């Protein structure tokens, strides 16, 4: 017979209900603290980084959009992000389907290899890609940069699309095949149309990963500039309040993209559940 009294359990329960939310709020505040500081500083009227800001101004946003070098870096980031995330979506979706529906040996090993760039330290991936592209003679051009970003973002696409394909009722695929559809017709007319929301979410995640990448970019980009690379160079050479405006824009973009991806995925999960 347990010696623990109901009164003790009740006290422990109340303590847990108080402690867990408190610790969670403290952790959330700690994680959000950089955002709480950076966002107000981006609207500062000061010539230097000061918190709290002495006055309100949009001068640093005007400085960003009025600087041709920043605009060029932004265009590069968008072009590289769109290209690499599209490549990652195609390769990642094909890989995810093979990993989920395949019946061959060694699937676990292949899955581990696909997600390796996500779990390895970025510096290791950067050095490996640097050596590989140098041997191919394409180091420092757009092809290498897009390929490197695709390598980094493909694991996220693989994981998201694997979840989506597992959630899709395989019996629907079997029915389509039994009614005379070829495997390609089943993929293009049955499976993929139902995975459009998940694919869009995976593409957004891949784009965010590419747009924020700096370590691998520093190794393989050569003279090409992206927003994160130029931010890093500015922080090393000269701290400019324009950085806070760019950081605020990136934070806002990332929050909107992730929220949109989560919303699209939730809607598709509901659709899959309804069909099942």
Model regions and ranges:
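Interhelical loop and adjacent transmembrane-helix boundary motif
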Residues: 4, 10-16, 61-69, 211-263, ...
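Transmembrane-helix boundary motif in ABC transporter permease subunits
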Residues: 3-13, 82-114, 131, 170, ...
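Membrane-interfacial helix termini and adjacent extracytoplasmic/periplasmic loops
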Residues: 7-10, 49, 53, 58, ...
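N-terminal signal-anchor/first transmembrane alpha helix
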Residues: 1-37
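Non-cytoplasmic
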Residues: 38-48, 149, 198-232, 247
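Transmembrane alpha-helices
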Residues: 22-35, 126, 150-151, 158-170, ...
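Periplasmic/extracellular loop-to-transmembrane helix junction in inner-membrane transport proteins
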Residues: 11, 47-84, 236-237
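Short membrane-interfacial helix/loop motifs at transmembrane-helix boundaries
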Residues: 2-4, 33-68, 220-222, 276
């Amino acid at each position: 017979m347990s010696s623990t009294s109901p009164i003790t359990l009740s006290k422990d329960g109340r303590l847990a209900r108080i402690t867990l939310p408190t610790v969670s709020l403290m952790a959330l505040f700690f994680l959000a603290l950089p955002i709480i500081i950076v966002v107000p500083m981006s609207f500062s009227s000061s010539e230097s980084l000061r918190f709290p800001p002495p006055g309100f101004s949009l001068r640093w946003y005007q400085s960003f959009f009025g600087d041709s070098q920043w605009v060029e870096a932004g265009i590069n980031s968008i072009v590289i992000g769109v290209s690499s995330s599209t490549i990652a979506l195609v390769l990642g979706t094909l890989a995810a389907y093979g990993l989920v529906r395949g019946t061959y040996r060694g699937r676990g090993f292949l899955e581990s290899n696909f997600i390796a760039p996500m779990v390895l330290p970025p510096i290791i991936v950067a050095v490996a890609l640097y050596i590989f592209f140098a041997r191919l003679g394409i180091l420092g051009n757009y092809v290498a940069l897009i390929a490197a970003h695709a390598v980094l973002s493909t694991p996220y696409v693989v994981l998201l699309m694997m979840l989506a394909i597992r959630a899709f009722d395989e019996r629907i695929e079997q029915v389509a095949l039994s009614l005379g559809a070829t495997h390609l017709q089943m993929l293009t007319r049955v499976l993929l149309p139902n995975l459009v929301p998940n694919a869009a979410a995976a593409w957004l995640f891949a784009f965010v990963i590419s747009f924020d990448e700096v370590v691998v970019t520093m190794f393989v980009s050569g003279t090409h500039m992206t927003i994160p690379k130029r931010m890093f160079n500015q922080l090393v050479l000269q701290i400019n309040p324009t950085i806070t405006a760019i950081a605020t824009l990136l934070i806002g973009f990332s929050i909107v993209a992730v929220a949109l991806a989560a919303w699209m995925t939730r809607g598709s999960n509901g659709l899959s559940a309804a069909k099942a």
